[in-house]
Amino acid sequence: DMKYVQWYALTYLWCGEGKQEETYTYGSRLREPVDQVEEAIKNYVKEQNDRQVTMVIRLPEDIYKENPKTKEKHEPPCLSVIDTEILNDKMHLTCYFRSWDAFAGLPANIAGLQLFNEAFVNDINERTNLGLTTGKLVFHSKNCHIYKRQFNLVKDLLNPKSIEKSARLAKTLNAYKI
């Protein structure tokens, strides 16, 4: 669902505006306390051959499994790093995931990061006459997995027995915003 992907890219990757109960989004980590996206754009406006433009989402305190002060469970971000580089007038992103939900997270993350790259390139192009386009997206994951609760959905997706079953699966996926 492209509407979901656009919402995800804007809300969770580009702007960082999550739900009130969320302690962070990838975007909030990219934008605060240092606006890494803006600084990366400024770096490329000054020096297109800069190979040091890496945005880090993970924080040192993400090492804790629970907040030392509140004792609440803490889940570190799955996406840890977005490394960027301009080669042959194309912006390439290399992304590292600590953990990656192959069924629900992976499709939205890939599509969302493509839209992130398009917005990133657009902002650079608006400030320069480079005429960059998006390049390759490269993904690394330490642990890409499918949760047990998703097994039947994944089986149905890979081996649809009938059109009716496929339509039911599509409705289920749409309900999950996948």
How would you name each of these model-derived features?
Residues 1-178:
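Terminal, non-catalytic protein-protein interaction segments that mediate quaternary/complex assembly
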